[in-house]
Swiss-Prot record:
<dbReference type="GO" id="GO:1990904">
    <property type="term" value="C:ribonucleoprotein complex"/>
</dbReference>
<protein>
    <recommendedName>
        <fullName>Small ribosomal subunit protein uS11</fullName>
    </recommendedName>
</protein>
<dbReference type="GO" id="GO:0006412">
    <property type="term" value="P:translation"/>
</dbReference>
<dbReference type="Pfam" id="PF00411">
    <property type="entry name" value="Ribosomal_S11"/>
</dbReference>
<dbReference type="InterPro" id="IPR001971">
    <property type="entry name" value="Ribosomal_uS11"/>
</dbReference>
<dbReference type="InterPro" id="IPR018102">
    <property type="entry name" value="Ribosomal_uS11_CS"/>
</dbReference>
<comment type="subunit">
    <text>Part of the 30S ribosomal subunit. Interacts with proteins S7 and S18. Binds to IF-3.</text>
</comment>
<dbReference type="InterPro" id="IPR019981">
    <property type="entry name" value="Ribosomal_uS11_bac-type"/>
</dbReference>
<dbReference type="GO" id="GO:0005840">
    <property type="term" value="C:ribosome"/>
</dbReference>
<keyword id="KW-0694">RNA-binding</keyword>
<dbReference type="InterPro" id="IPR036967">
    <property type="entry name" value="Ribosomal_uS11_sf"/>
</dbReference>
<keyword id="KW-0699">rRNA-binding</keyword>
<comment type="similarity">
    <text>Belongs to the universal ribosomal protein uS11 family.</text>
</comment>
<keyword id="KW-0689">Ribosomal protein</keyword>
<comment type="function">
    <text>Located on the platform of the 30S subunit, it bridges several disparate RNA helices of the 16S rRNA. Forms part of the Shine-Dalgarno cleft in the 70S ribosome.</text>
</comment>
<keyword id="KW-0687">Ribonucleoprotein</keyword>
<dbReference type="GO" id="GO:0019843">
    <property type="term" value="F:rRNA binding"/>
</dbReference>
Amino acid sequence: MAAARKTNTRKRRVKKNIESGIAHIRSTFNNTIVTITDVHGNALSWSSAGALGFKGSKKSTPFAAQMAAETAAKGSIEHGLKTLEVTVKGPGSGREAAIRALQAAGLEVTAIRDVTPVPHNGCRPPKRRRV
């Protein structure tokens, strides 16, 4: 009794024609994640330092953030994207490098917005590092 083999059928990405979108840059102390969406929030492309093969402390470098932004930008340009609003979240070192990489990839940045969450005296923060 042989089980029927399932062929490897993968859904092809549909090319959308979207002029403007939003780049969400999440820059933490450990990694940088860049997601490019349309104005409604539907993801067009994404990339991160970890997904590109950077490991450990190399993920948190500005160079890794730059490479992640370039990869995400190339994927969104395939969908016809030309202009971007940028939202930056987090305290990481890859914030500025990612924005510069998006501009260098040929996308026009119309606005940069910092949406880092700031507590109004909420949860107690973690203890200070002693190095």
